[in-house]
């Protein structure tokens, strides 16, 4: 325990800030509260990025209601790999990554074989807000599956690593992987 505290203090002395401090001391102070719904929703963020000319994974479709779940076969078509995400999820919770498809079943990136019904259940769980910030009703987005380059294999854990550049008052102040 004391070793962990020592390590944390050493990192802090080097100017390395943890995510908790960032979230507590900087996010509320430098971001307008009324803009949170834009950045907390992956669908809105993706649409804004596209409008700004930023390349993002192709979005195949959005499911907003239980009734729309029956549109899943139409949305994914013949694609053998895709990703389903909660629009307002955080920390990777609720994300289902399909790597292959065969004989009416799907294979996740972890190697688990699941049925179409299990995917529908996951979509339903997303819509009820099981994975959303604050537990509110949500939407599911289905999009292109990004496969990371092998260079990231030794430094990333579960999922596709993303590189984030944190900009404060117009200046890049930190980055994270």
Show which residues each predicted segment covers.
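Phosphate-binding site of ATP-dependent enzymes
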Residues: 110-177
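A conserved helix-loop-beta module that forms one wall/lid of the active-site cleft
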Residues: 22-132
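Generic detector of short alpha-helix boundary/capping microenvironments
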Residues: 3-6, 37, 153
């Amino acid at each position: 325990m004391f070793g962990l505290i020592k390590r944390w203090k050493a990192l802090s002395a080097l100017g390395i800030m943890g995510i908790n401090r960032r979230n507590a001391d900087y996010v509320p102070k430098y971001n307008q509260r009324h803009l949170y719904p834009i950045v907390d929703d992956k669908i809105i963020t993706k649409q804004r990025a596209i409008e700004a000319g930023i390349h993002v994974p192709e979005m195949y479709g959005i499911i907003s209601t239980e009734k729309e779940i029956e549109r899943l076969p139409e949305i994914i078509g013949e694609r053998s790999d895709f990703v389903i995400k909660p629009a307002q999820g955080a920390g990777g919770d609720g994300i289902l990554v399909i790597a292959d498809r065969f004989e009416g079943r799907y294979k996740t990136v972890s190697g688990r074989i699941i049925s179409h019904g299990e995917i529908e259940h996951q979509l339903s769980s997303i819509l009820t807000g099981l994975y959303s910030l604050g537990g509110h009703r949500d939407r599911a987005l289905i999009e292109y599956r990004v496969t990371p380059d092998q260079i990231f294999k030794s430094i990333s854990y579960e999922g596709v690593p993303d590189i984030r550049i944190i900009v404060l008052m117009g200046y890049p102040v930190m980055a994270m992987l």
